[in-house]
Amino acid sequence: MATGQKPHTDIHARLQSLGDWSARFAQTPDAAALAPFAEAFSLAYRDAFPPEDGVADAQTLQALPAEPPLALKLARGTDARQLQLKLYGRGQPASLSRVLPLLENIGFTVESVQPYAIAPDYWLQQYTLTLPAAIAPEAVESRLADAFRRIWTDATDSDRLNALLLVTTLDIGEIAVLRALGKYIIQAGAPYNYEQICAALNANPDAAAALIAAFHAKMRPQAGDATAAFSELQNRLQQVQSAEHEAILRWYFDLLTALLRTNYYQKDANGQPKNRLAFKFAARDIPGLPKPKPLYEIWVYSPKVEGVHLRGGKVARGGLRWSDRHADFRTEVLGLVKAQMVKNAIIVPVGSKGGFVVKNPPADRDAFMEAGKACYRTFIRGLLDLTDNLVEGKIVPPADTVRHDEDDPYLVVAADKGTAKFSDIANQIAAEYRFWLGDAFASGGSAGYDHKGIGITARGAWESVKRHFRLLGKNIQQDDTFTAIGIGDMSGDVFGNGMLLSANTRLLAAFNHLHIFIDPNPDPAASLAERERLFRLPRSTWADYNPALISQGGGVFARSDKTIAISPEMKAAFDIQEDSLPPTELISRLLKAPVDLIWNGGIGTYIKASDETHAQVGDRANDALRINGRDVRAKIIGEGGNLGMTQRGRIEAAQNGVRLNTDAIDNSGGVNCSDHEVNIKILLNQAIEAGELDLAARNALLAEMTDSVAEHVLRQNYLQPQTLSLALARRENLDDYARLMQQLEAEDRLDRAIENLPDDASLGKRRDASDNLTAPELAVLLAYSKMWLYDHLLASNLPDAPYHQQNLRHYFPAQLAEKYSKYMATHRLHREITSTWLTNDLVNRLGIAATWRASQASGDLPALVNHYTIARETSDAAALWQEIEAQDNRVPATLQIELELRLRDHLERSIEALARHGVSGDDLEATISQLQKRITALLATAHAQRGQSRPRDKAAWQNLGLPEALAARLAALPLQFEALNTILAAKDDSSLEEDWQQTLTRLAGQGMFQ
């Protein structure tokens, strides 16, 4: 045979064989419907598979779904532990680098793979797989196909937990539940990593299956009694051999026990599982969670985003943060919600906070932002998936959702770090869900109040700054310049607005993450104008500051510089001796500089306590420049930003003479403004539904009320710091504060260690040293006192009393009271608003410990509110407060404090008398009217017979600048109390005059009328 003859024969034989293959393909059943595939298979395919397989494969290819165009089939291999997997597709063939890890995570060992091309653009890949144990293809094929599709489309994850597919009957969706709960366990602070959690589940497949069985029994609609399933789960857990595995699995058990709702059974518009899992827990029922535990917690999980939302109560509000703390963002959110609970003591909702992470953020900036928005949308949808709706005033629960809790329709969100521009996105999703709150769901959107435009947060914090300066005898708005160090830049809301609020600001230095601005001897007028220019300039930085306006020795320096030369002017202004410093050290020196004010409007924690470590602070980016509270030499700190100091750092600074409050006190204006916006929109939605108002008119009305809303908000920013000033002036109240804390602890409302409040032994030392609590400590206790009173009022029928419901008109702007007051009583939160208004009014005026003292006297906090209301109205206290506060910068601030305390003492004596004589609050209007008339008559008699009361007090106050009429009214308060007490003690009207004459004689003998 000639050379080359054999190959010719082989080719001929192969062509003959292929022709036979095509003929046999055409003769098979259904071949007519598959005609396009008759010649589509490659030579390699025809060599490997008979025509009958070609028909079956062609049918599979023809039936490929549009998205993704994938399918798979399983067949037995050469032995019981081997399977043949065919993967079908269209377009670009599947990458082995993606397929192999997917299969290996499921538990397969891939022995070989053979690809085949099929015209025009189909492909097939055959994998030879071995298994740890024998398994029938039909037992796993459909679950494997579903898993492959969902992993391929990024609808679920590919990791070791998917090995449960082969050793249990769980499907990929059920495994996703275990994965999501496992990731929550890590965020909850359990001492396990994800590898340990996967190992525990994979090593105990029966327990894993029992977990899912219990999940279905409890949460599947129409599932019935879950008792048996949980009993079986307990049995399975007792059989686990490894102590670590059992501990991990018991975390799962605890989560299922505390689980209230899930969206697992909900479907999207196409009838498919949703692209996220959401779980709502009764957090206080999860033993392993760190304190403080919120009331409710929602965990949202998907392959692209993880998020958590913590709520302190059923009516709660707070921002959603785009976190960069992937490993422990729940810890970050827990710290924020603790602060939010304290901050929200002045508003209707209690505190909530949410946070989410983008799990695989792209490097490109624009793509990064789009990924963040997409993850935010998923997070918001996960929250709304588990939230009840209101339709025509009736609760409508989420579809296909078992609820193990009460109706829960109130969910509002706000902006936070990273989500400042996302409110409209949230409201669009609320509209998609037809959520009852509409665009009140996320405040600050395009039809809401622009916090930066109003400057509400900075203006609120500035009320604290002005008060601190008044107590130092300075009027910074009119006469007195002051030096300041700033944290932030002029493009920021809080920093920028704050540095425009006084023409007397001498900003010596400021820093942000990019620059250090130094102006050792600024001209107040010129620098104010330049700061205003930067504030108006989009995306400005300190580098945009006109260098010609910076004083000698100053400049703008990059934080990336190796060192910064210290000019003589800088040395003098900031008490620096070195000739040069690294940027981080220069910032530390600025924070320690002897200035009047540190104004914090930035992000980061810059001051801690000397006994705290940087790791405890949890802000690694600022470790190099952070200082201790005892090293602060500024006279005042204004906390426009959040978390600028640790609480222990605040306390240490206060104990070393720095005047400050807390961030929750200073910057509460933002959350208060948002709450007003939400409640106004809820009110006006009623008018819209009644046809009295359309959306355009509502938006116009919202804009018209901007100044009025700001005025309402700033009122609390004035009153709360005033309450702290009064508390600091009364050191003798320390025992009352101690007993209040003990009471709150007894009711499991307060954990002193968490809130950095002193224990009884520490309080004893302060008492011996004649020390008080510091302002930061009092600020926390103020919030807890308000929360305690609020809860008692809300649980009573007091908010429904007609007299107290009149306070709704005080809460809302006057424009609403004039035209839409009829909707106030039917407002969804009318009881909460009334309780909040009463709580703020009473605690701000009577002080932090008033609630405890009243509870000891009568044990009835609602009765305290009624008696306080009677005392306030019969004393005309509101007018007196207004006149005292009008004396700001006219008389010494210490005199104002003295007068406020005199008025408070009068009210407390009156309340005690009303309680002692059992005065009812059933008809407040009649009681107040009757007492007012009688008191007026008795005072008229006294003045006619005896003249003015306490003339020496009146004269002393006038000498300090107090108006004569106000001095006279305040001097008459003791006589006014005696009139009230005489009326209450009188047996009847006939004896009242005689009793009053006896009282006047006694008072004259005591020098009342000298």
Can you name each region flagged by the protein language model?
Residues 1-108, 112-304, 316-323, 367-371, ...:
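Non-catalytic interaction/regulatory segments
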Residues 69-76, 86-88, 98-100, 116, ...:
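Generic recognition of flexible, low-complexity loop/linker segments
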